[in-house]
Amino acid sequence: MASLRKTHPLLKIANDALVDLPTPINISVWWNFGSLLGLCLIAQILTGLFLAMHYTADIATAFSSVAHICRDVNYGWLIRNLHANGASFFFICLYLHVGRGLYYGSYLYKETWNIGVVLLLLVMMTAFVGYVLPWGQMSFWGATVITNLLSAVPYVGNTLVQWIWGGFSVDNATLTRFFAFHFLFPFIIAAMVLLHLLFLHETGSSNPTGINSGADKIPFHPYFTYKDLFGFVILLLALSILTLFSPNLLGDPDNFIPANPLVTPPHIKPEWYFLFAYAILRSIPNKLGGVLALLASILILMVVPLLHTSKQRGLMFRPLTQILFWTLVADVAILTWIGGMPVEHPFITVGQVASVLYFALFLILIPATGWAENKALKWN
């Protein structure tokens, strides 16, 4: 008689995704980040739920309610710091996951990849509205600056901004709706994650060699369940160390000052995980151009599958494109650094060069090198 996990309608779905899933035998630790992102999402939803029980979405009491959580709620300080630093780890895993996809050609599974890009955008939106909730100086001014970018939309821009604000400035209506969005989005993300997995399991995972692994697969459980659990332990250990030893390392000191519409902070900047996109936005001395570049910096990922010129899938055996990939990694690191710097010489020029290089790598250099490698191997 067949086991219950193979016959029960619900358990069968879980079984096919987590137990009997045929998995390439040679997937490396770079394939761990999908499950780590799942862990991050669950951790963020749980800590967020407990924070929402004590938080008040009102400009008069929002800042005080966060202070109350940290001072008076049992382990409130821990829950709040886990949630804030959990977001940083979420983005670390996200960027590594995307980097893995770019390196090993996972983007050729187009549906999985495009849903992944939508997921990235959703997580970024969620993090943005979440950052506004403590109602500190950087929360308020970050919300003002970023929502104001929509005024660059021709004709309807100003109307759009006032519609999002719910008034003529970032005020109580804005905070209330941002809290509603911040509560809602993670559940939309969870639904999208299921779609992401559904499409992935249509094709199966790729593997480091980039060649078909149909003849060489092993069951997901126990091999990769334990491998994933090991990843969970490392991630939770790192998160615990950051949260317990230096919880405010990645935050902005300005956010310990309650929001004041009359005083602008000297340097308005987002959390570290948005700095690369912020640097690209600032590198164009035109509002609409900057907004378009900001959108393009993420949406360019959707174009990557269309610009794949190589006859090989990944970069494992493509040394020239490898150099360009690591140039891209270095470029994003430089953009992240520039995004946190004031708008003055030489940072402006460095930011502009890094921004041009960012788009050139995706649109010109990597596709051209793929084509050149085909020629060198006489594969055309």
Swiss-Prot record:
A GO term, aspect molecular function: metal ion binding
Classification via CDD domains: cytochrome_b_C (cd00290), Cytochrome_b_N (cd00284)
GO biological process annotation, one example: mitochondrial electron transport, ubiquinol to cytochrome c
Xref: Pfam families: Cytochrom_B_C, Cytochrome_B
Annotated Gene Ontology cellular component terms: mitochondrial inner membrane; respiratory chain complex III
Residues noted as binding a ubiquinone in the record, renumbered to the chain: H201
Keywords carried by this UniProt record: Electron transport, Heme, Iron, Membrane, Metal-binding, Mitochondrion, Mitochondrion inner membrane, Respiratory chain, Transmembrane, Transmembrane helix, Transport, Ubiquinone
Binding annotation for heme b b566: H97, H196
Family affiliation: Belongs to the cytochrome b family.
Annotated function: Component of the ubiquinol-cytochrome c reductase complex (complex III or cytochrome b-c1 complex) that is part of the mitochondrial respiratory chain. The b-c1 complex mediates electron transfer from ubiquinol to cytochrome c. Contributes to the generation of a proton gradient across the mitochondrial membrane that is then used for ATP synthesis.
Subunit description: The cytochrome bc1 complex contains 3 respiratory subunits (MT-CYB, CYC1 and UQCRFS1), 2 core proteins (UQCRC1 and UQCRC2) and probably 6 low-molecular weight proteins.
Protein name (database record): Cytochrome b
